[in-house]
Amino acid sequence: MLSAQHRDIVKATVPLLEAGGEALTRHFYGTMLAEYPEVRPLFNQAHQASGAQPRALANGILQYARHIDRLEALGPLVGQIVQKHVSLQVLPEQYPIVGSCLLRAIREVLGPDIATDAVIEAWGAAYQQLADLLIGAEEDVYAAAAARPGGWRGARRFQIARKVPESAEITSFYLKPADGGPVMAFQPGQYIGLKLEIDG
């Protein structure tokens, strides 16, 4: 449970996140992707290499710390994270991996003089609050998608029905469900996760 004291400690770390959030998230990703290779497919490796992913996470953590008393201010950011997580089929059991690696990065990057036991405890409680919020919101999206006409939950096999060259650089791929069933309505620009099986 996130206490008032925890909130105060998290808010007190905002200047540290402003100054060194990216170093913290780079360390976090380095640790997590090395020690938990099973989560690597959930992350865009080009964004890892360019630093875009660590920057985005650093900004998200900073915004969370700044608004920990007013989580409703994070609505658009949380909504975007939830949609991305659902497209990748992020599961509740993956959150403890992220949490343990994040707390470890805080301790290792900030050092024991700053990342005291009280700071780690506060950030542990704060992370759990955020994880619970995301898990709940993601479950709502998963359940709503499964309940829609043509909807489903989890992975569903599709086949390429046709390929249309649109230009020298763009090809459109039209997919159809392998089970022949209907597909729920979709919107341009929404996230979708693909796992490809390529012969040869």
Residue ranges and their predicted role:
Residues 1-200:
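FNR-like FAD-binding dehydrogenase module
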